[in-house]
Amino acid sequence: MTLDHDVATRLQRRSLAWRLGASTTAAIGVVLLTWALTVDFVKVSNAGFFGDAATYYTLGHSLATDLDFEFQRDDLARVWKEYASGPEGLFLKRGSDGRLFYAKAYIYPLAAAPFIWLFGTNGFLVLHAILMTLCFLCAYSFLCARSHPVSALVFAFAFLFISIVPVYVVQIAPDFFIFAIVLTGYYFWCYKEVAPLISELQLATWRTRWLLGPRSDLVAAVLLGIGAFAKPTNILLIAPLLVSPLLRSQWHRAVKIGVTFGLVVVALFALNTAVSGEWNYQGGERKTFYSGGGVDFKGGFPFQDDAKTFDSVGLARVGGGSFDVLFTRDTLLEVFRRNLAYFVVGRHTGFAIYLFPGLMAIILFLAATRDRAMWQWLTLGAGVGTAVALLLYMPFTWSGGGGPVGNRYFLGTYGVFLFLVPPLQTAVGGLLTLAISGLFVMRIVANPFYASTHPSEHSKSGIFRRLPTELTMVNDLPINLQPDRTRQPLGGTPPIFAYFIDDNIYNREGDAFWVKGESTADLLLRAPISPETRAAGVEEARSLRIEKLTVILETGARPNRVTINAGTGPRVVEMAASSQQSFDVEMPRGVPYKYHPDYPTNYVYSLSIASSSGFVPMFESGSPDSRFLGVMVRLIPAYGASQ
């Protein structure tokens, strides 16, 4: 089949850059949309919710079906049509008039509501597919304005698809939505800075008028206002748009951008006030609801039956940060310093690991000494400033709770680093980005649904084991989604708590555990809080440190060489078969952990145990135990009071 002559003539007039970009963008859009429309989302997500998905799912369907923001019995019953497990992790708040509302920003499910009305739950994915296609179009268009088309194509693909972005494309969560909104907003602001010179006739077209004229600044301000409402930590991203015109003495332009941004943010919070009676969508009396209860709360959901109400079930939450936590000596001097390193190369959150194309963009920008503009320096400052603000404001949960893959709180900011990329005349930079980033994330993005529901699996092996574990977020690491691997009581009075962050430790047996044969196991230890009895008979919690650790090792049918390292130097122990040895290990100071002002400071430690040999009891003694065992370990801490 041949193309019509007129169509062929028009295509020949288009540049290679235009044809390559248009065809690739169309192909990506077709693939993503067909995937979004046909995937069985309930099955691939293991018929359950993770993170905050239950809240956004329920609110999205409420807006699509009932056209309201209120949580009612019909909203709860609707969940069971698809999810037999119910809305696990549903996050609700009581409004000023006593009605129940969703304690999350409404803008993401509101944007998804038309697609949910048309396509059901897959409407979330349809929205994501459209946004991902738009992001690629923006990324390619910006890069291609100064780079060879092939180079632009390769880097744009790496930036979007060979990072953790695809993991959040498959989740019912606002993180990818915020990323797309911010990236698109910066595109409207930045494109005019790199666009080639065009004729007045071309300037008159609607496409170039919006992109190259002052209206594009207002579009950018609107989009960044939406992003700031959805994630207030992104508020610093408006700064380059305000400072850049001020440096050029364009005062009127700066005022228009600032007013537009402010009006959007105020309007969105005003709508929240009109609906719920409170401006803060996470403020007031709020609770998280699960089908099963816990130590201090009952399971169930409001309206599930007559006995289950907002007051009778659910886990109460306290909103907002606290200066009692943020501005302590430990937080500013010890925790912040560690968080800077974790932020860049952390095992579960590192920017250089999960969002490497952003780091490559920074490197290319700093290396291109002749092509660095002031607006790009401002963009870099906004990105870095947002990271620092995040670490200072949320020192113990800056990657997002719920066991995320990578740093989901910073994902929205990641997009701005694209606009640091200088002109690329060859594809070397993009190919290098593909190779290095692929080493870290290909095992994740190859199956993003599995990575979303099993966020700790990739970090248990390979290069991730060589990266530092984020001790400052011990209770927010992905392994916390596995209750039998976290907060495990071992020896000591009171018992020390262990977190088994890989699969080289078998589940606890009493106060001991087996390390897998021929393996190195990593675990975290958290010192408990000791009640201290006052003269008046009132118990007050007291922080404890681990001064030393008594290690008791026991081998099985094979001799073994065991190596223990607590950060104070390795200790190597040669052991005969069926023998036992004990010794003391001096412990480092420990990392302070105080995520809430009502709780005393805990101290967290990292420990590795390596077993050089192993045996299978089934083949040694006829036991039914088929595990590959290395060495059995008991840990008994000696505590000292925190100074």
How should these model regions be labeled?
Residues 1-44, 141-144, 214-216, 253-260, ...:
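Start-transfer (signal-anchor) and selected internal transmembrane alpha helices
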Residues 4-6, 193-196, 236-270, 363-373:
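Perimembrane helix-loop-helix junctions
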Residues 60, 155-160, 207-231, 238-245, ...:
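Membrane-interface alpha helices of multi-pass inner-membrane proteins
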Residues 65-108, 112-116, 287-334:
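Interfacial juxtamembrane loops and adjacent helix segments
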Residues 123-147, 180, 184-187, 366:
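Transmembrane-helix motifs of polytopic, lipid-linked glycan transferases
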Residues 138-141, 158, 177-209, 216-224, ...:
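Specific aromatic-rich, kink-prone transmembrane helix
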Residues 242-245, 343, 350-383, 417-422, ...:
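Hydrophobic, aromatic-rich transmembrane alpha-helices
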Residues 254-364, 380-393, 442-451:
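Membrane-lumen/periplasm interface segments of specific transmembrane helices
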